[in-house]
Design a protein with these regions (language model features):
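A short, Trp-centered hydrophobic/proline-enriched beta-strand micro-motif
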Residues: 44-62
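Acidic/charged, solvent-exposed loop-and-adjacent secondary-structure segments enriched in E/D, K/R, S/T
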Residues: 103-131
Length: 195
């Protein structure tokens, strides 16, 4: 297994974790569900069925603070692996997702509310094929709209996640994810690594 380094996953994880420390108490969130907004949980989309090895640099903004991370992602048709490091090179989290089951290890210094499913959900919303994401979101009452330069996730006609893309395609581009429901944003620089 290759060692991974990139920022999107860990930053999303930390930011979603900060946001999910006080979720709507009326819903129970499963380990394989991602929290899009307070009270809105969706099952994780399945792996895309493709082979991807990508490195990401992530800068996240939450409540006046800035966080930076690195992550490396490896996906095969049946599995998704991620390793996230903080800017000191410390391993923050390792995630293995196979057959709808997620195994992970996390550093003790991560906030308690940091959830790998939220991190993977943000990765899917930004980088996975439109139809895969749209189908997963529809199952929980959310919709995905593609714009000329990004994506918008809506729940009850309210924007809960906005994604804007810069140059490039697929895993080889910069993206900016904003989640006004939880008050965070993530700037991602992603590059696919030749296999």
């Amino acid at each position: 297994m290759k060692i991974f380094s990139g920022l999107l996953p860990l930053t999303a994880l930390v930011l979603c974790g900060c946001a999910t420390q006080a979720p709507n108490a009326s819903i129970a969130i499963q380990d394989n569900e991602t929290l899009l907004a307070p009270g809105v949980a969706c099952a994780m989309p399945p792996p895309t069925g493709s082979n991807v090895n990508a490195a990401q640099t992530i800068v996240a903004h939450f409540r006046g603070q800035t966080y930076s991370f690195e992550a490396q992602i490896q996906e095969t048709p049946d599995e998704f692996d991620l390793v996230a490091l903080d800017n000191l090179g410390r391993r923050a989290m390792s995630v293995k997702w196979r057959g709808g089951h997620m195994d992970y290890s996390r550093a003790d210094w991560l906030p308690v509310g940091v959830r790998p499913a939220d991190m993977l959900g943000d990765i899917a919303i930004v980088f996975w094929p439109t139809d895969t994401v749209r189908t997963a979101l529809a199952a929980c009452g959310a919709t995905l709209i593609e714009t000329s330069n990004g994506r918008v996730v809506k729940v009850h006609n309210r924007n809960v996640i906005d994604v804007a893309y810069e140059h490039g395609e697929g895993w080889n581009r910069a993206a900016h994810l904003r989640n006004p429901a939880f008050g965070f944003s993530i700037d991602i620089q992603s590059a696919e690594i030749a296999q």
